[in-house]
Structure formats: C-alpha cells, structure tokens
A protein has these predicted regions:
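Flexible loop/hinge segments at secondary-structure junctions
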Residues: 1-267
C-alpha cells in the first residue's frame, strides 16, 4: 500500500504495469489543502495565483518585450504588485520529488501561468515550452528547498518571520498559535473552504493497494474496512482530529464500496 497527496498519473500507472503490477485499488481518503504559511508576528498576506507564479517562476515574460522570456528578476514582493509588502521574496518548500510540490505547481503555479497571455498562447502551439515555463521554479535562492518534512518548515518560519512556507493544511491547523495562512484570491484556508472546494489549492488524498498482495498479507481487508468506516474518515471520525478534511458523504460511500469490493483502478 502507498498513500499519495495526488492521484497517480497515467505514466506512473504504466510504470506499475511494466513492472508486473497491473491491478490496483484506489481509495480517495479525503481532502487537504496547500497553504502558503508565515509567522503570526507579521501582517497577513493576500496573494493571487498570478502573483505566486511571478514570484517563483524560473522565467517570466520580459515586461519590456512580453514575447521574450527572461530569468525572474523580482527580489521583493512589491516589485510584482505595489499592493504587496516591500519584503524580500523567500519561500520554503519541498523538492521536486514531493507530491506536495507537484500539487503546488498544478494548483497554483500553472493556474497563475495561464493568466499571462503570452504564455497562455503557447498551450496549444508549443506545449513543451508552455509546460516548462509554467512548472519550472526559480533556483536563485528565492525558493528554498527544505526537504519533505513539513515540521522543519514550521521551525524555520519561526526563525524567518517574513518568509513563506509551502505546507499541507493540517500543519497550519496544528500550528495556528505560531503561523497564519496567506489568503488565496481572497479565500482563507480553513475546514469549510477546503471541504466546499472554495479554496483553490484544495487537493484530494489517496491510498493505493496492490491487489496481488491481499491474499498473502493478513489484515489488509480488515484495514480497508476500518479505514473506510465513518468512525475513521467520517465527519466525526478520528482522522479529522489529525487534520483530514472528510470527503462528501457520497464520495465516502462510493470509495468504501470500491475498497470492500477491491474494484480495479482505471484512469
């Protein structure tokens, strides 16, 4: 079994098939959100997808000649938009191997990228260039890779109060005495906004089970039965206390049925 902070891709599933793992069970466990958190000792920030993209992209359109792309020149937030504070751009986050990084890029960077006309025009005409521009994060020190342990980011944000940190919502929720989340297009990351999918950076969480192991490893069926019970992942389930935002009742019923019937995964 493996848990994932995004859905498996077609390429990853094909890699499983190529290695003899053709039968998987997919269970959507619930929801989480990606947040840009920072210290409570500084004023709160309100950001848009476009501002986030312009702060962290490796290359952006040249303001003087938008058809040309240049290395990201921005060093302070107010250079992007004068409504933003005059503080150095510093964002701590996970490495490329992280599912949280993938989610951050797809939910925030790419959406912001598409709001820039000269880049959006490349989506159909030059898809490879479009993907590179939208998905590449700058490497000049404005983005600081801090590993895949969100607790380290929490600790570093206390020491660097003007920096932002890319975290899962549950880590923000567990550290609200020290941290606050940036508004995203005017919406705060909280239980209600993520559950209602009003917060743009909400993401589903998954569990994948290798079917061929089930007959030989005791307890997997029982584990799936318990995991998909209302006492575990429901509105009052104990996973909510750990930061999970439950899926809708309809989704929970559908994925419990899939889990108990060991339904084959399909894209």
């Amino acid at each position: 079994m493996v848990s994932a902070s995004r859905r498996i891709t077609a390429g990853e599933f094909q890699q499983c098939v190529d290695n003899g793992v053709a039968e998987l069970v997919e269970i959507k466990i619930g929801y989480d959100g990606i947040v840009l958190a920072h210290s409570k000792n500084v004023p709160p920030m309100s950001l848009t997808n476009k501002q986030i993209y312009l702060a962290l992209a490796g290359k952006i359109p040249n303001p003087a000649a938008p058809e040309q792309f240049i290395d990201n020149p921005y060093t302070s937030w107010n250079e992007i938009d004068d409504s933003l504070p005059k503080i150095k751009i510093g964002v701590m986050g996970p490495p490329p191997s992280s599912g949280t990084r993938d989610a951050f890029v797809s939910l925030l960077m790419e959406k912001g990228c598409e709001q820039i006309p000269t880049i959006a025009a490349l989506k159909q005409a030059k898809r490879s260039q479009f993907d590179t521009l939208c998905q590449s994060i700058r490497s000049d020190g404005a983005y600081i890779e801090t590993g895949e342990n969100d607790n380290i980011i929490v600790q570093k944000l206390e020491m660097n109060p003007t920096d932002l940190g890319i975290l899962g919502y549950n880590f923000l929720d567990q550290n609200r005495d020290k941290l606050q989340g940036s508004l995203l297009d005017g919406v705060a990351a909280d239980y209600k906004s993520i559950a209602a999918r009003q917060y743009e950076a909400a993401r589903p969480l998954y569990l994948y089970v290798k079917k061929s192991h089930i007959p030989f490893i005791p307890g997997i069926n029982e584990f799936l039965y318990d995991l998909t019970s209302e006492e575990t992942w429901g509105e009052e389930g104990y996973l909510r206390e750990k930061g999970l935002i439950p899926a809708s009742q309809q989704e929970r019923q559908e994925f419990r049925k899939d889990a108990l019937l060991l339904k084959d995964f399909t894209l």
